[in-house]
């Protein structure tokens, strides 16, 4: 089995997802857009994972490869491949499905609470729908949000952002937050994006972010692994 991963910057990698893939028999391949824009044949991909990055999906003039990436993501979705989008990756799914991505009312940066929601569409779904815990803590680093793709089911929200997670059909999940975060990956994004830590209602300090207890990482990893198992069942 092959998991193909779309990476946008060197400091936002797979985190805790990588050992799960290896332990579950996946060969891992990458498109690192900061090095090369080469994408595989859709038919060769068994699982697509789209990671985060500081750019916007709207920055096509500065990053022309975004056009190619959106087309590839749409092809994978249309082909029925399991697709997981994280942060920019969730926004990429929304954009690939024809929806708008735009600045949110607030930036969210740090370890912040998330609430599961009961979307009415969940009740009438003809397929299993993932359920988050009622409340949990996840790592956030975003300033933009998006409109849900048509027929997508909202799964989670925060006080600052309505669309934190969604499921599209049986095999596509988008997460605005990061569940793959490790101590190393948290330190890496803080180091690379420290200038974004401008005090605001939903922005933690560097000290607060890096002082998060181990339980935050373990809980996030547990939910991340549940989602991966759900998508690939």
Regions found by a protein language model. Give the residues of each.
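Cysteine-nucleophile active-site neighborhood
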Residues: 50-120
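N-terminal beta1-alpha1 cap of cysteine-dependent amidohydrolase-like domains
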Residues: 1-81, 198-233
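Glycine-rich, phosphate-binding/catalytic loops in enzymes
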Residues: 20-23, 64-68, 101-102, 157, ...
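C-terminal and late-domain segments of enzyme folds
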Residues: 155-156, 161-167, 171-233
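Hydrophobic/aromatic beta-strand patches that form the interior of the parallel beta-sheet core
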Residues: 4, 29-31, 49, 84, ...
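Pocket-forming structural segment of enzyme catalytic cores
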Residues: 97-184
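Tryptophan-centric aromatic hotspots in well-structured domains and transmembrane helices
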Residues: 20, 111-113, 125, 141, ...
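Short glycine-/acidic-enriched loop or helix-start segments at secondary-structure transitions
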Residues: 15-16, 59-61, 94-96, 150, ...
């Amino acid at each position: 089995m092959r998991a193909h991963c779309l990476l946008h910057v060197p400091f936002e990698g797979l985190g805790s997802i990588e050992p799960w893939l290896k332990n579950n028999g996946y060969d891992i391949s990458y498109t690192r857009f900061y090095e090369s824009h080469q994408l595989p044949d859709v038919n060769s991909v068994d699982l697509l994972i789209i990671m985060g990055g500081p750019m916007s999906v709207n920055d096509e003039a500065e990053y022309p490869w975004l056009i190619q990436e959106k087309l590839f993501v749409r092809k994978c979705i249309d082909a029925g491949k399991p697709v997981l989008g994280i942060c920019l990756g969730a926004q990429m799914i929304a954009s690939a499905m024809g929806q708008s991505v735009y600045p949110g009312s607030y930036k969210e940066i740090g370890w912040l609470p998330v609430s599961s929601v009961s979307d009415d569409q969940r009740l009438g779904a003809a397929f299993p729908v993932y359920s988050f815990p009622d409340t949990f803590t996840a790592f956030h680093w975003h300033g933009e949000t998006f409109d849900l793709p048509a027929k997508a089911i909202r799964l989670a929200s925060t006080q600052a952002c309505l669309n934190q997670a969604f499921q599209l059909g049986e095999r596509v999940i988008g997460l605005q937050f990061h569940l793959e975060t490790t101590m190393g990956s948290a330190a890496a994004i803080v180091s690379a994006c420290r200038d974004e830590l401008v005090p605001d209602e939903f922005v933690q300090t560097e000290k607060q972010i890096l002082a998060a207890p181990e339980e935050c990482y373990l809980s996030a990893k547990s939910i991340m692994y549940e989602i991966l198992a759900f998508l690939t069942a």
